[in-house]
Amino acid sequence: MKRIKIKELLSNSSQYIDQQVVLKGWVRTKRGNKHVAFVALNDGSTIHTIQIVLDVAKFNEEQLKDVTTGACISISGKVVTSQGAGQSIEVQGDTLEVIGVADPETYPLQKKGHSLEFLREIAHLRPRTNTFSCVLRLRHAMAFAVHSFFNEKGFVYVHTPIITGSDAEGAGAMFQVTTLDLKNPSKTKEGEVDFTKDFFGKATNLTVSGQLEGELAAMALGEVYTFGPTFRAENSNTTRHLAEFWMIEPEMAFYEIQDNMDLAEEFLKYLVKYALDNCIDDLNFLNEMYDKELIERLKSVVETPFVRLNYTEAVDILIATKQKFEYKVEWGIDLQSEHERYLVEKHFKKPVILTNYPKAIKAFYMKANEDGKTVRAMDVLFPGIGEIIGGSQREDNLEKLQERCKEVGIHENDIWWYLETRKFGSAPHSGFGLGFERLMLFVTGMGNIRDVIPFPRTPQSAEF
């Protein structure tokens, strides 16, 4: 008989009454007496468990002894209407197979609750908890929704390289990739590491962004997006930073900054609505356990138009408020999370899109405004998060881009291929980046970014 998933059984319970089924999964709990045992079984398809009723007389003592929390079992039996409270149906077990035992003396996940800090230490087992099974199902749903959104709009999914010779952000915080002997690398006459002897014949690193390569594709395909891992070697031990994370980066030909903002708002609302429509059981659990306002906040984002505001106007609001900030506010600063969250959570009480930032604090590729002081950048700010999306209209004029490269010290030889897209058939274009884990923080209500990715990579931590 073919196995049925618990989600399918619970979703269509009436049609399975009095039917024989086979279930396989992991034991969450077992209780009972010398006559009957009640097993809560979960197979990962849903937050919910199904109750298995075992007549002790049918099974040998050795089998039942191994049915402990964490054990993997296979059950066949009849679906019946439940006599007890808490579930509409249950399965009366006819046959039982213990596929994999879990010694209750050493299995670290017992019935008691565990702190999130403890669970990070056993990241290989935490998907078996209710919390992290919810997070991982939501992560899957959000990834699926990303592809669905862009596919419906006719965007082309482009795979950009993980190993690259460029620094898209100009930040310099990159992980180097090399096959040179680290104890005795080849050296130049000047005593520098000779990367011409390296695998790629030049210095290379793990990508910090797929944006530049995405722009190249947009200049041929019109509207594209990337969705892949990115890496930043920033020594930031905060609840908002990871060394390895995932980015969604659309790039669109013929989009001005207003078009870019429109797309970003539509995209975020689509993703949040998808979670509400398709993952409500998981959201209800997280709402109950971690954030009592989670679902209301998600609904508010879907239903509320985002505020659109110039950076200068935002600075004026922040200076005028009586709120005390750790970082002083003045025109020209890069707004901190506390400033962004004040605007979103206290002043407007809704998502905000900030535009027209000072040129000096933004990347070289952003298109300058006519005032010469600001660029057509945009950041989307969310409650509880701060910046969730960063983007801009890109500079499409070759001479202006070359001039900007000189200003920030970027050698044209390093990005000659990027500059050539402005040399041949240049077109106005825009794009943005959405940090997938920051989206997951918002959608799940979790407080630490290390709890929304299966195996977090942070300073001094690369386990599993």
UniProtKB/Swiss-Prot annotation:
Provenance organism: Cytophaga hutchinsonii (strain ATCC 33406 / DSM 1761 / CIP 103989 / NBRC 15051 / NCIMB 9469 / D465)
EC numbers for this chain: 6.1.1.22
Domain of life: Bacteria
Name of the gene: asnS
Gene Ontology molecular-function annotations: asparagine-tRNA ligase activity; ATP binding; nucleic acid binding
PROSITE patterns: AA_TRNA_LIGASE_II (PS50862)
Keywords, alphabetical: Aminoacyl-tRNA synthetase, ATP-binding, Cytoplasm, Ligase, Nucleotide-binding, Protein biosynthesis
Name of the molecule in the record: Asparagine--tRNA ligase
GO cellular component: cytoplasm
Record GO biological process: asparaginyl-tRNA aminoacylation
Major localisation: cytoplasm
PANTHER family in UniProt: ASPARAGINE--TRNA LIGASE, MITOCHONDRIAL-RELATED, ASPARTYL/LYSYL-TRNA SYNTHETASE
Family named by the database record: Belongs to the class-II aminoacyl-tRNA synthetase family.
Catalyzed reactions per annotation: tRNA(Asn) + L-asparagine + ATP = L-asparaginyl-tRNA(Asn) + AMP + diphosphate + H(+)
Subunit text: Homodimer.
Membrane-spanning residues: none
Entries under InterPro entries matching the protein: Aa-tRNA-synt_II, aa-tRNA-synth_II, aa-tRNA-synth_II/BPL/LPL, Asn-tRNA-ligase, Asp/Asn-tRNA-synth_IIb, NA-bd_OB-fold, NA-bd_OB_tRNA
Compartments it resides in: Cytoplasm
